[in-house]
């Protein structure tokens, strides 16, 4: 496990609350997340795990409290700097969010095209990340023809194509068989070993128990347990 006692927090949450109308999704969450940490966010469905991840990349905005990322206060960030912030993140969505009418290669390339990368660099990078996740031979396939595990591999390739500092993974193994889930975890551990900070939201307690990593437990929007503390 990352020795957090010697680290400076890269993400800081101070008394964060999030409400949707009268419903509270997060209640007074205070948390430090450290550079190159692999953090599990564990809790049942509806606990606030996805909401917490969305707040970090400004997919949602806090109702109260503050979030700082590398010292940047998200409440004060200008519209021009939102894109800069989001480039820090690679996001693995629970439902993959692959475009069915685009090939595997094209789905991964979209991230780099949006960042304005030159075509030659895009070609090289996409081939590299597809090779890293074992999907190079499926580059010209379309998502509907792939298995769930294969689609998740493509989603991971897309998430890491921009060399993000932070990977947010929302239930990345939730719909996969045990063998596919294990291979996805190995991929994420590999990117963590190469320097990425990984935040993984899951309802599966076994995932967290199989790694010597810090786990926080969310229940009904409340941070109840951090282990180890």
Give each language-model segment a name.
Residues 161-165:
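A short, proline-enriched helix->beta-strand linker immediately N-terminal to the Walker B motif
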Residues 178-180:
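Helix N-cap at the start of a conserved alpha-helix in ABC-type nucleotide-binding domains
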Residues 142-146, 150:
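Conserved ABC ATPase signature
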Residues 167-170:
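Catalytic Walker B motif of ABC-type/P-loop ATPase nucleotide-binding domains
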Residues 102-109:
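Short coil-to-helix segment of the ABC ATPase nucleotide-binding domain corresponding to the Q-loop/switch region
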